A protein has these predicted regions:
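Helix N-cap motif at beta-to-alpha junctions
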Residues: 122-124, 238-243
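Non-catalytic beta-strand/loop surface segments
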Residues: 3-67, 86-124, 146, 159-165, ...
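Active-site recognition of the HExxH zinc-binding catalytic motif
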Residues: 70-82, 315
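A common structural junction motif
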Residues: 134-144, 252-261
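Short secondary-structure capping/junction motifs at helix and strand boundaries
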Residues: 126, 138-151
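Short amphipathic C-terminal alpha-helix that caps PH/PH-like domains
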Residues: 76, 129-137, 249-253, 317
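Short, intrinsically disordered, charge-balanced linker/junction segments flanking boundaries
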Residues: 306, 310-318
């Protein structure tokens, strides 16, 4: 292609002056054109997969390595979806579940990242989902209403003056359930024991024993640090006006932020000099027998997920 204006497949990127093109590739296996962009002002990174799939997908994600096991990434994932500047309702997520035409709607906390994915085949619905999620992550009501943190994270409860003080909270109770499952306990122990000197040694979802150690200010500081476009990854997929979506992202949100360095690097674990053994107890019910109720796991680190062929090979084996 020649001339001042280049047409990259489905997009005229020369008109999108707010973005820098980092790479483009035809993805023949999925009949798509792929683009990697960077928003010049904020530093946000965007992956665009343009094709004729009517099921449109959007997500924004942030690297959120936990510094402890208080579950702050998980609590923030819950709480940013409890109202925002543009959508000041108690629970926008529930409203979307009830009234949206979405084909997928969720928010997911991983050991090192938090993502907010949505999908819809309806153009107007898809745009609304994007708007609700972008406003939720960048302008949540958590700074105005401390009770959101207490409701979703943890708080003390006293049913009556003679009752004992108890701890309650959506994430707190969710993780109590997760930590009662032997399979979940083993999965967490594997990750923690293989990478003891990294953020993977901590529980991003929150350990019920440590969740009550999280303060409101620590929680807000985590959001201020990591929920910035400079630390974000945005993904757009499907049959849509990509130029329009990118302009909207720029004008409504990304251009309101300056590029700031965010230290969210995921450090590699130094290899062990010898094999290690870890033993941990887990809870069983009074009806269960301890006999034949033991789990054994042998684990090795074989590389990183950035090695595409190695990663795919082990996905197949799994």
């Amino acid at each position: 292609m020649t001339g001042q204006e280049r047409n990259y497949g489905f997009m005229k990127l020369s008109e999108l002056t707010a973005y820098e093109l980092l790479g483009e590739q035809e993805l023949k296996d999925i009949h798509s054109m792929g683009y990697i962009l960077r928003h010049k002002k904020s530093g946000a990174r965007i992956t665009v997969i343009s094709n004729d799939d009517e099921n449109k997908v959007f997500y924004i994600g942030f690297r959120t390595p936990p510094e402890d096991s208080t579950g702050v990434p998980h609590i923030i994932e819950h709480t940013v979806l409890c109202g925002s500047d543009k959508y000041p309702v108690k629970d926008p997520f529930v409203e979307l579940v009830k009234g949206s035409l979405n084909t997928f709607l969720n928010a997911i906390t991983y050991p090192e990242k938090t993502i907010y994915p949505v999908a819809s085949c309806n153009n107007a619905d898809f745009q609304n989902l994007m708007s609700v999620y972008m406003d939720a992550v960048f302008h949540p009501d958590i700074y105005k209403h401390r009770e959101i943190f207490e409701q979703e994270g943890w708080h003390y409860e006293l049913e009556d003056e003679d009752a004992p003080v108890t701890i309650n909270g959506v994430v707190y109770n969710e993780m109590k359930g997760a930590f009662s499952s032997p399979d979940d306990v083993l999965e967490r122990l594997i990750l923690n024991s293989l990478f003891p000197d990294t953020s993977y040694a901590n529980e991003s979802g929150g350990d019920p024993e440590h969740i009550p150690e999280l303060t409101y200010e620590q929680y807000l500081d985590f959001h201020r640090k990591y929920y910035h476009p400079s630390n974000s990854y945005i993904y757009l997929y499907g049959d849509m006006d990509m130029e329009e979506k990118l302009r909207w992202l720029d004008e409504k949100y990304l251009s309101h932020f300056e590029n700031e360095p965010v230290d969210s690097e995921i450090h590699l674990q130094k290899p062990f000099t010898e094999m290690r053994e870890v033993v941990q107890n887990y809870s069983i019910t009074s009806e269960e027998s301890e006999e034949d109720n033991t789990y054994l796991s042998y684990n090795k680190v074989v590389g990183t997920s950035l090695d595409e062929k190695l990663y795919l090979a082990f996905e197949i084996l799994d």
